[in-house]
């Protein structure tokens, strides 16, 4: 039996953050409490996240993950891939609050995906199918290329890198929601050019502050307009080390 890990202060923090986003977490608080307990227990064994305190986990994992719901781009019964999920963020909070989403959390580190799989089962999340692998490989596989309605990612790479990794996985008309910190004009321009190169375009740039903490965030929404050229994504590691239209040393959060 997983103990109730959310203190009254933690529950209030979760409610305030969700309220700021126009979301109702009240029916799901027990799942978030169990998720916190599981994350803390798993972190002791597996070193899953640098965030340790209840406040940091609630704000910077739970609430931060839910900000990807801004704009309504994830509202629907979408087949959705979480690119670079790590310990399951934003996939697990999204699965809790949006059970209609069909989520595939992707990470190259098996221990993290094993944790996500076990945690989803413990939380009763039947809409989560974790996958071990790299986006470069999945993006060139017949099973995954062009098969997703939505891709979501939180701050895992520079925007041009994310565009090359995410857009090949989307069907034409699909949408990629990327969450990053403050975004420079240079990175945005490179991301716009990279998106065009791999078959898409940026349709929305939404700067905002994280509820409660006030940390700066940016949601960038890209739409896939045409099939991605066969040469993209490039082989493993190349998109990160040789980003399209962007010097690797310039990469930011």
From Swiss-Prot:
Class of enzymatic activity (EC top level): transferase
List of residues binding S-adenosyl-L-methionine: 84, 89, 135-136, 154
Pfam families given in the database record: GidB
CDD domains recorded: AdoMet_MTases
GO cellular component terms listed in the entry, alphabetical order: cytosol
Compartments in which it is found: Cytoplasm
EC nos: 2.1.1.-
Keywords: Cytoplasm, Methyltransferase, rRNA processing, S-adenosyl-L-methionine, Transferase
Positions of region (Disordered): 228-253
Main subcellular location: cytoplasm
InterPro entries: rRNA_ssu_MeTfrase_G, SAM-dependent_MTases_sf
GO molecular function: rRNA (guanine-N7-)-methyltransferase activity
Family label: Belongs to the methyltransferase superfamily. RNA methyltransferase RsmG family.
Role noted for this protein: Specifically methylates the N7 position of a guanine in 16S rRNA.
Stated name of the protein: Ribosomal RNA small subunit methyltransferase G
Organism of origin: Deinococcus radiodurans (strain ATCC 13939 / DSM 20539 / JCM 16871 / CCUG 27074 / LMG 4051 / NBRC 15346 / NCIMB 9279 / VKM B-1422 / R1)
Gene assigned in the entry: rsmG
């Amino acid at each position: 039996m997983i103990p109730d890990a959310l203190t009254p202060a933690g529950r209030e923090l979760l409610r305030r953050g969700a309220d700021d986003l126009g979301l109702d977490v009240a029916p799901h608080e027990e799942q978030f409490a169990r998720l916190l307990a599981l994350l803390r227990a798993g972190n002791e064994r597996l070193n899953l996240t640098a965030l340790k305190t209840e406040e940091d986990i609630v704000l910077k994992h739970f609430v931060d993950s839910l900000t990807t719901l801004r704009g309504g781009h994830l509202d629907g019964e979408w087949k959705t891939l979480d690119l670079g999920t790590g310990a399951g963020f934003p996939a697990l909070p999204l699965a809790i609050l949006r059970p209609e989403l069909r989520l595939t959390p992707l990470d190259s580190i098996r221990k993290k995906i094993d944790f996500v799989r076990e945690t989803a089962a413990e939380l009763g999340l039947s809409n989560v199918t974790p996958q071990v692998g790299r986006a470069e490989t999945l993006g060139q596989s017949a099973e995954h290329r062009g098969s997703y309605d939505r891709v979501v990612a939180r701050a895992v790479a520079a925007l041009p890198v994310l565009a090359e990794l995410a857009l090949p996985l989307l069907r034409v008309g699909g949408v990629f929601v990327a969450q990053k910190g403050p975004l420079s004009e240079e990175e945005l321009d490179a991301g716009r050019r990279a998106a065009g190169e791999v078959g898409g375009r940026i349709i929305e740039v939404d700067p905002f502050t994280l509820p409660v903490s006030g940390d700066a965030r940016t949601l960038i929404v890209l739409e896939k307009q045409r099939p991605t050229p066969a040469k993209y994504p490039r082989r493993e590691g190349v998109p990160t080390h040789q980003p399209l239209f962007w010097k690797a040393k310039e990469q930011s959060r």
